[in-house]
Amino acid sequence: MSTRPTLSVIVPVYNTGPYLQANIDSLLFQHFKDFEVLLVDDGSSDGSGAICDSYAEKDPRIRVLHKENAGSASARNHGIDHACGEFIVFVDGDDIVTEDYLLHLMESDADLVVTGVRKFGAKTGTTAPARRDDFGIGALAAHWNLSSGVNYLYCYQVAKRFRTDIIKENGIRFDESLFFSEDMHFNMEYYLHADSFTELPYADYGYRMMRITRDEKYRMSEAQLATHFESLDSCFRHLLDRIGPDTLSIVRDDTNLRLLRKFYSFLMQDGITSRVFVRNVMAFRERSWSGYLMSLLQGKKEIRVMREAVRFPLLTYWTEVRLKSIVNHVSQG
């Protein structure tokens, strides 16, 4: 492309063959036209790379970057390195977007623009901000509501529009050492340097909900929780000067509570053995900061099981197993 595009759409691709064509087609049929698409083939073995190449031959807005497999965080970082647009948008390779997606993201000139998502697949549902809201860094706490089921700033790297210069000039990257929720860390790093934010009441992003595999469940561990917590703690220390201690306390507590919820939701899945479950919970209890995290759970009825799991891990595990067995028996009867 002879001139710099307004938007760079970065799509990490890894064995998404069954969904890839729908994904790319949804991007090419946008009402907003000034963009490039970077398809980052992360060592696919199912022909996804060839699908990407075939689209690039037909549309000059598409660039394909082939690389060895190193995970989605690495693929997104590779896309950032090659992005030419003034702004960056991330779209996962198995998702789809409406034809107004990019147009809506360009309604504001804020450093960060956030919209909602429409979930489909294993789970369904639509979540989006209720109305347009423009705000600065000083109002961050008001949009980081501990009692809210959805935090549009915290979750996802998709359904957002970032400013490329902020990312590149400050060396903001996806942490390639993390197994899950690397988007959380990327977003927090970005907030250290962004001044203006806009939430928009759209749900143009189609987020495909995939079932977690047995292997992924076994990879979830206390060590992963520790890595996340320690990395986020560094972000929180830097945020202190920008938003003050009161706002920081709200952001910190809410973010860590959501992280803890995710950790235990993985541990309570089918397929986790009692040995793995107890080992992870006991290791978590040994952490110097586990008391702080557990204090966040006080009074939260929906996660009472987590509190009991920390106090009585083996009993809690077998209680869960027994309850699931009863439910299965009744449903089959």
Predicted features along the sequence, with ranges:
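Donor-binding/catalytic cores of nucleotide-activated saccharide
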Residues: S72, G93-L200, Y205-A226, D233
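Glycine-rich, basic loop-to-helix element that forms the pyrophosphate-binding segment
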Residues: K67-A83
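Short aromatic/hydrophobic "clamp" motif used to bind/position activated sugar donors
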Residues: I88
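Cell-envelope/extracellular polymer assembly enzymes that use nucleotide-activated donors
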Residues: P5-S8, S26, E36, H185
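A conserved acidic beta->alpha catalytic loop
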Residues: S26, D41-A50, D92
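Short beta-strand/loop segment that forms part of the nucleotide-sugar
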Residues: D34-G43, R63-E68, G93
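Short, well-formed alpha-helical segments that are part of the catalytic scaffolds
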Residues: N15-F29
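Membrane-interface aromatic/basic loop that binds lipid-linked glycans or pyrophosphate carriers
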Residues: Q269-G333
